[in-house]
Each structure stands twice: as C-alpha cells, then as structure tokens.
Amino acid sequence: MDHDLITKLTGQVIAQMRQRTIPLGISNRHVHLSAKDYQSLFPGQTLKIKKPLGQPGQFAAEQTVSLIGPRGQLKNVRILGPLRGQTQVEISYTDARQIGLTAPLRLSGDLTGSVSVTLKSEAGEINLTEGVIIARRHIHMSPLDAAIFGVTQGETVKVGIEGTDRKLIFDDVCIRVAEDMRLEMHIDTDEANAAGIDGGQAVARLLLTKR
C-alpha cells in the first residue's frame, strides 16, 4: 500500500478516535487514609470493599467517618481504598463552607499547606494537621489514550459536557496520565450540579488543548 495513503488513513482514524466521548465520574466528598490513621480510627478492622470504582484497583469502602470543622460536621463520609501513604480529604466548595473551612483547589497528592480537619469514627478521633483539598477537575488517561487525544501529563484542556439539559464547558481540566489509568473525567458534586448531571447519560468531550 502507498505510504502516503497509509499516512492519510492513519490520520483519519486518529481524528475519528479523538471525537469519542469520555466517561464521567462524579466524586462526592471522601477520604483516603494512611495505614497509621486508619488503625487509629478503625483499630483491628480490615478495610472492607463496598463497591469498585472506575479506576483499576480503587474502591469505596464500607467504613465512613465524620469530618468536624470550626462550624459543623459532615457525617458518613466514605473511605476510599486502597490505603495511601498520606491521608487526604476531598470535599467540595459547598462542603467546605458548611463546616467552616477554606480548603485550597489542588490536584490529588498536592497537600502541602492545605487545611486541617478532625476525623472521627465510632472507635477513635484524629486531628489532621493538613490534607483537606478541593480536587481540581481532571481526566485520567493511559499513555495510549493520551497519544490518541494528542495531550500530555499535566496539560490543561477544555471539555464540553453533553447529555444534559444544561450543556456546559469546563476550562482548565488537567490531564493525568499513568499506565494503570482508565479513561475517565472526574468532577465534584458542585460541578455536576452546575451541569445538571442526573444519572449516567452525561459524557465529556475534549474540545481544545492549551499548550
């Protein structure tokens, strides 16, 4: 087959693949615990899987905690597994205002200088000196997905939300690339409500990269 024809056909296939939609995951408030903090809150207990999540190996656990801030508390906040090296609490702006916190907007794992909160279970209580964030909206991709979409780790893009009565465009969506990632965009409940997302019909579509 002619080389130029192969190049042309390959380009057409990639262009079509870039038009595919991206599944949406809505992140409610949740906690990732370190092994040490987990044992303080749930001594002698095994972290029990309630249901698997969209990313391979990740799951919602049966265990929950309360988050206690200066002006109130949020009860029954789900623990996500597996356990991590450092405890991280992810809430929305609405949640933060409700309990009197001024949490920074960060990517997962960027916890230096973030705010504190008290975590309480039936068996224990810990004061987390830092670790509370509002998660930046982002898209998980494998290296192959990133190559197909023409994006790189850490890049920000524009994404359109489709399949709702309130179509919306999100700017500054961060690309997160790793071998074990499955294609999925993550937004929080505030963002989902703004887009009128109710149920599983909504999807995301990559609109524009910002290099």
Swiss-Prot record:
Q: Which reaction does it catalyse?
A: propanoyl-CoA + phosphate = propanoyl phosphate + CoA
The protein here is known as: Phosphate propanoyltransferase
List GO terms (cellular component aspect). bacterial microcompartment
Q: Which organism is it from?
A: Shewanella putrefaciens (strain CN-32 / ATCC BAA-453)
Q: In which pathway does it act?
A: Polyol metabolism; 1,2-propanediol degradation
Q: Which InterPro entries match?
A: PTAC
Keyword Metal-binding attached: yes
Recorded coiled-coil stretches: none
The residues the record assigns to binding Zn(2+) 1 are 30, 32, 90
Q: Which UniProt keywords apply?
A: Acyltransferase, Bacterial microcompartment, Metal-binding, Transferase, Zinc
Cofactor note text: There are 2 Zn(2+) ions per monomer; Zn(2+) and CoA bind inbetween the 2 domains in each monomer.
Q: Does Zinc show up as a keyword for this record?
A: yes
The role this protein plays is: Involved in 1,2-propanediol (1,2-PD) utilization within the bacterial microcompartment (BMC) dedicated to 1,2-PD degradation by catalyzing the conversion of propanoyl-CoA to propanoyl-phosphate.
Essential cofactor(s): Zn(2+)
List residues binding Zn(2+) 2.
Answer: 138, 140, 186
Q: What is known of its domains?
A: Formed by 2 beta-barrels, each is capped on both ends by short alpha-helices.
The record lists phosphate as bound by 84
GO terms (molecular function) for this protein are:
acyltransferase activity, transferring groups other than amino-acyl groups; metal ion binding
- Per the record, the major location class is other
Catalytic activity, EC: 2.3.1.222
